[in-house]
Every structure is written in C-alpha cells, then in structure tokens.
C-alpha cells in the first residue's frame, strides 16, 4: 500500500519547528562527517555555489561557508534557519550564507543550472513519498549546472528501526514523533537514472546506530 498524505508531512513540519525552538543547536556546531566529505568532493569538482536542503540550524551550511563556498541553505523550519543566520553573522559569514524557508514538496525557488553542488543530509528520508522524492531529485537536476554534484544521505532498510514503530506505508515508519522513509537500494538506483552514480557508501551514525547510505551522483 502506497499511503502518504500532506497531513503527515505537515505534522512533521510542526514537530521539527517545535524541536528546533526548544533545543537550539540540537546537533551541535561540529559539521557532520558527510558534509566534511562532501566539501572535499565539491572542491575537487571546482564547485563554488552550494545548495543545502534540510539545513536545520546550519552546522553543515556554516562548515561549507567556512571552507570558502557560497551557500544557499533551505529548511522548512524557520526556527532552525534563524539560528543559522544568527550564527553566520557572529562568525562573520553572513555574506557567504543565504537562507530560505522552503518545503521540498514544492519546486525549488532557483533558476535552471544555477548551482554547482547540492547537499542533503537525511532530508530525502523524511516524511516524503517515493513520488515526492523522485520529483525533488528531478528538480535538483534542473537547478544543477552540467557536471554538478549531488550528495545525499538516507537511512536504509537495513536500519534497526526499519519495520518497527508506527507504519505509514511506502517504507515510512514513525518513532518518537519523527517519521523516516527507509530507502531500499532500488530506490537509490532509480533516483540515479539519467545521472552518473559515482558512489554508494555505507556508514553508521549516532546511537542504535542509524545505518545510512551516502550517495554521490553527477549531473551529465
């Protein structure tokens, strides 16, 4: 059964907004390991302009800015992005970082072929249907310049939480108020259709631990 509606995603948006407001800087200030890796890949590819989707309070966006990239950071939580803007100002990075509240179920508010690289850490595996994920990746391809790189991470069906908690259909399960779309490998492959799939790297993060893939693909 492929069940997904706007109610779950809207509830998740409200949940994240409350979470960021109640726990400023909840992920700390150190960048994620995937962001550190991505910065090296982006630099080697000659990228200058980076779009981060699902930036949260901005630890990775700030890292990209520190590393010399110009960053456009989006998230559906205004609370998280406000923390990001304040930190960017205090670090002298305000000119390198712009923010926009955006729901990835809607088209990206960017022109065609306008960014060199896109990064999304655990954004695609949120409460998005398979159809919505495909639409988002098509739009990411649209805004990337030729030879642009897209790096994303997702929890996959080998994760200990897969198949447990509250089921919402379409491989989406909810734990502790947070809904996760666990990726099967064939979804990764289908999202790379028309791209060059450079790497699917398996890694673990946090307690449990969470089991994820870090996917790198390049727009032709």
Which residues are covered by each model-predicted region?
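Class I (Rossmann-like) S-adenosyl-L-methionine-dependent methyltransferase catalytic domain
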Residues: 1-45, 50, 56-106, 149-220
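A short, conserved alpha-helix within the catalytic core of class I
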Residues: 127-139
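Short conserved AdoMet
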Residues: 128, 145, 192-193
């Amino acid at each position: 059964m492929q069940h997904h509606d706007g109610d779950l995603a809207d509830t998740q948006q409200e949940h994240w907004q409350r979470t960021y407001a109640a726990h400023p800087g909840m992920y700390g200030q150190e960048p994620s390991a995937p962001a550190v890796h991505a910065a090296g890949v982006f630099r080697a590819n000659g990228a200058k302009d980076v779009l981060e989707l699902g930036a949260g309070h901005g630890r990775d966006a700030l890292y990209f800015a520190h590393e010399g990239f110009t960053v456009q950071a989006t998230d559906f939580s205004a609370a998280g992005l406000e923390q990001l803007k304040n930190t960017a100002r205090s670090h002298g990075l305000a000119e390198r970082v712009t923010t926009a509240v955006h729901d990835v179920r809607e088209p990206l508010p960017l022109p065609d072929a306008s960014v060199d690289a896109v990064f999304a850490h655990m954004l695609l595996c949120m409460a998005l249907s398979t159809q919505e994920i495909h639409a988002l990746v098509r739009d990411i391809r649209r805004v990337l310049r030729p030879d642009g790189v897209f790096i994303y991470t997702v929890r996959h069906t080998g994760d200990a939480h897969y198949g447990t908690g509250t089921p919402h259909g379409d491989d989406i399960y909810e734990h502790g108020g947070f809904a996760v779309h666990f990726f099967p490998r064939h979804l990764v492959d289908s999202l790379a259709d028309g791209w060059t799939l450079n790497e699917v790297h398996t890694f673990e993060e946090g307690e449990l631990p969470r089991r994820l893939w870090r996917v790198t693909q390049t727009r032709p």
